[in-house]
Amino acid sequence: MPNTNDTQPTNERTRAQVTTARTVAEAARKTGEKVQSRIIIVENLADTSLVIDQAGDPNTVVEPSAEALSAAALSPIMQRLAALEATPTPAATVAEQVQASARLNRLADHAGITTRAIGIGWEDTSNAARRNWSEIARAAVTRGYNTIDLAAGRPEWTLFQWPAHPEWVSLEPQENPLRDVIATLRANGIEKIYLTLDMMVSTSLAKFPEWKAISRDGTIRNMPSPAALTRSPIRDMLAGAVAQVAAQFGDIIDGIIITELFWDSGSFSDNDLLLYRSDTGAPDWPRSEDGALQETPEYREWLTTKMADFIAHCRSLTAGVPLVMDVRVNWNQPLAGRPDSGHDYAKLLRVADEIQPWVYYDTGEESKAIALVYALNKQWPGRVRPALGLWSATPASVGKALAGLATAHRVQVTPYSKMGTLLR
């Protein structure tokens, strides 16, 4: 049914869609070229005394095989999900790319290369002209930071030009502040730059409420549902933004970070149910004897697969630019991830280059944060980039955590606006 609330002329919308499609197609074409160059870099760095891809190495990217699992040990729904995961998709190429990236990270670790990153939020990047980026870079380098992560906005209000969707751009037509900021940061000693893309699309979800996630308790969330990640317009909007960032900045950045993409106690919308039925063959959601919705292992397997499938799609559009996925943490069982949020770490690491766990702890709980980071690093060496948050922890507390993580190869501190004494 046509959306009668949309005032954009059909021909303009069609032209915009064609432009977006061309951007996506160009990103896909470049993927093959860029991944080959990255693989060559890895091969040139290879140390013959270092064995990376040993059998059983947790860092090796291996797609699950339905044949390798005993059919008798799986329920019919799990058998169908396993077959769905094993179906050839563009993710096969993505898996090859992230495996090459993982090997490069392990080689960097072996060489003693570390990443100490600062997350700079929208509050600063949206006011780029009012910030002294040379001074920001010099202060960061002086305190041992070598990487800056810059907020690039959300698909609905971007800090980058998007010709297909000028209505979503928060800039004047000739402005390109992020490119200027990146040049200044690099000129003043910052070695690596990442752009962070927030996946919240509140305005679009208000326009298309049928694509909102609905938690197990019935709460309607301002987040895209699993089904929304498989269908237009939400899927195209989110993935299109990733493709646009890669196309516009891929030559000058080291990666793209996807943030704010998760669910709370799953998602059980009507559109989700249609998708669940199609994927699993089940007639309804899992329920208890009294009819209450349940997050069974089969359900969480489905939920996390939908998230990983979407991230694989995004990664396939980056033209070889590494993709980092922000994830929630499980304090009680760190390696279990957060399947209720759609975050199965092992699945995500088949299609994303790294995960960035939100290690947002309270002051006084530094040891808990340190233990979690080392547990994740041990399981997935070279693939974990923890973010220490300053929302509930003081700069002094995060300083203690950083000292305890001295041997960790990758750590981010966020946000810059709250770092205070950490930069003095």
Tell what function each PLM region has.
Residues 136-137, 154-203, 298-318:
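Aromatic-lined substrate-binding rim segments of carbohydrate-active enzymes
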Residues 194-198, 255-264, 293-340, 382-393:
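Aromatic-lined carbohydrate-recognition surfaces of secreted/lumenal glycan-active proteins
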Residues 351-370, 380-424:
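Substrate-binding cleft of secreted/luminal carbohydrate-active enzymes
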